[in-house]
Amino acid sequence: MNKYFVHQSSYIDDNTSIGEGTKIWHFCHILSGTKIGNNCVIGQNVMIGPDVIIGNNCKIQNNVSIYKGVILEDDVFCGPSCVFTNVINPRAFI
């Protein structure tokens, strides 16, 4: 028995790690190599990965996209429809 919840409409690729108490809601896609910590909430229609790391106790609202290689530390809140890319512009503060 899983110690996390994934709605039946979501897709979880092979080679992913999902922490205890995490909930993944409708129409999400979690790509290969992604690690999601404990007690996270992933809202509807979220795309994560590949090779993304999400810390513990994170809340990711509906329609968020998190692209390859992004790392979110513990206790991060992502508002609706935000997009995290893997492009870091010179002289940018992240």
Which stretches of residues belong to each language-model region?
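Flexible, glycine/small-residue-enriched loop-and-beta-strand segment within the central core
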Residues: 2-8, 14-16, 23-94
